[in-house]
A protein has these predicted regions:
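Nucleotide/phosphate-binding catalytic cleft detector across ATP-hydrolyzing
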Residues: 1-75, 144-152, 165-174, 182-185, ...
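A common structural junction motif
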Residues: 128, 195-200
Length: 215
């Protein structure tokens, strides 16, 4: 249960209260039982944990940001993992909807790795050298176009995920980005440098906040 209101008023302890109208916001995350069982078995064999719990990454990000930024009623969470990106839409302190697309930080490195026929670690090293301004002219010449390609592919999928919310007519202005430290700025800039006006009511650029250890 994310929130509960009685007669339009939000309450944390509704027990014993009387009301004419009850509204409950409930978030459910589902997964096939066989998938859960396989993951549970693998984790148990390796780590020997007494208790293993499963939760939604998007929901965890939402709860954390809601507590850290209590004045932000509505916002978008972009959580970039190794293989996937979660996009969460929060409205009025409630997780409204979530979407996942198969592009994460490793997708960037694979684009370079496959194009240059090098291993993934080498591709990561070259990508970070270019992003940090320490690459040679030759490396910039070969890697920069591939980084642009990876950015274009990621932005395209992010744009498509936003288009799923257009019918709601109220895409939030604030975007929180959670990403691996080495590519955090890269993902933030990927959103900042693109135009998503067609998805917003205000026709303003997104206010993109990179969430890190200093936040």
């Amino acid at each position: 249960i994310q929130s509960l209101t009685l007669n339009g008023y939000s309450l944390t302890d509704p027990i014993g209260k009387k009301a004419e109208e009850l509204k409950i916001s409930l978030f459910l995350s589902l997964s096939p039982r066989q998938v859960i069982d396989v993951i549970h078995e693998e984790v148990e064999q390796i780590y020997r944990l007494k208790k293993i719990q499963f939760s939604s990454g998007g929901a965890c990000c939402f709860v954390s940001l809601r507590d850290v930024f209590p004045n932000e009623e509505s916002f978008i969470v972009v959580s970039v993992g190794s293989e996937v990106t979660d996009v969460v839409l929060v409205r009025n302190h409630t997780l409204a909807t979530a979407f996942t697309f198969p592009k994460g930080s490793h997708s960037v490195y694979r684009t370079i790795s496959e194009s240059l026929s090098i291993d993934l670690q080498d591709a990561k090293t070259r990508a970070l050298l270019c992003e940090n301004g320490h690459a040679s002219a030759e490396m910039i010449r070969t890697v920069s176009p591939l980084l642009l390609k990876a950015r274009s592919e990621w932005v395209d999928m992010f744009s498509k995920s936003l288009s799923m919310y257009v019918n709601d007519l109220s895409i939030p202005h604030t975007v929180f980005v959670l990403a691996p430290n080495d590519l955090g700025c890269w993902y933030r800039d990927s959103i900042v440098n693109e135009s998503f006006h067609q998805y917003t009511l205000t026709e303003k650029d997104f206010n993109v906040i990179l969430v890190g250890s200093e936040t």
